[in-house]
């Protein structure tokens, strides 16, 4: 398949961004180089005019080519990469398999993760004046609810194997590991979710996943390095 954009990609990323984590995994699995531009969310670099010109939503990640073409939203970026660089495939060959993988991915990317993002936490803090303990309870509730739902789907489906769907990583695994990382950072016990835990550990043993880990990035704070697990 002909690649639409052969020029080097600029990848706007941040070490702690789970959406950026997903795209890093996909780039690694595909063996695709990119010019990484770090956007410090903690310093509100995503809210500057410079980044607003890249992505008016002021969210990460974004892929930009020299001709000005910009892609945003992690799942759209990953599907583009999969269509233009089909090996290894991140979606199954059959329509039902693709629908299942997308559904699992969407459970995380469109239902679980949005409730944990910095802009939601900022609203809970600045607009609703929730205490730290209340905000922690919020994050924990939605993280656990998503884990439980995914576990039920994975454990009850014969299509689940070494990974979420079959024996090779798919878009579903790319999304799953980020959500589990969010659970680990909250010290949530994964014992009630054995299928999720097994797949997470299997995926993170692969170099493409391990090298994409939030705690293993060039912009990861030095104090956080080496804590990836």
Q: What is each of the regions a protein language model found here?
A:
Residues 53, 205, 214:
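Phosphate-coordinating loops and pocket residues in cytosolic domains that bind phosphorylated ligands
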Residues 112-205:
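GST-like fold's C-terminal all-alpha helical module
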Residues 82, 179-180, 213:
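Active-site-flanking alpha-helical
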Residues 1-134:
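GST-like domain detector, emphasizing the conserved glutathione-binding G-site
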Residues 44, 200, 220-221:
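Generic structural signal for helix capping and beta-alpha/helix-loop junctions
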Residues 216-229:
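Acidic/histidine-enriched, glycine/proline-rich intrinsically disordered or flexible terminal extensions
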């Amino acid at each position: 398949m002909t690649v639409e954009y052969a020029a080097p990609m600029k990848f706007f990323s941040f070490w702690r961004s789970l959406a950026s984590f997903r795209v890093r995994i996909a780039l690694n699995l595909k063996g695709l180089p990119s010019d990484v531009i770090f956007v410090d969310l903690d310093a509100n670099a995503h809210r500057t005019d410079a980044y607003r010109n890249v992505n008016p939503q002021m969210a990460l990640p974004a892929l930009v080519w020299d001709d000005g073409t910009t892609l945003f939203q992690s799942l759209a970026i990953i599907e583009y990469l999969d269509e233009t660089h089909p090996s290894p495939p991140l979606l199954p060959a059959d329509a039902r398999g693709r629908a299942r993988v997308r559904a699992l991915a969407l459970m995380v990317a469109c239902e679980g993760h949005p409730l944990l993002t910095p802009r939601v936490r900022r609203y809970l803090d600045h607009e609703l004046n929730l205490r730290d303990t209340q905000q922690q309870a919020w994050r924990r509730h939605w993280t656990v609810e998503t884990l439980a739902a995914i576990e039920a789907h994975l454990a009850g489906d014969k299509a689940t194997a070494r990974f979420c769907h079959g024996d090779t990583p798919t878009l579903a695994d790319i999304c799953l590991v980020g959500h589990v990382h969010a659970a680990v950072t909250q010290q949530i016990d994964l014992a009630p979710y054995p299928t999720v835990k097994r797949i997470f550990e299997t995926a993170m043993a692969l170099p493409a996943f391990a090298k994409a880990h939030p705690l293993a990035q060039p912009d990861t704070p030095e104090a956080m390095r080496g804590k990836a697990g």
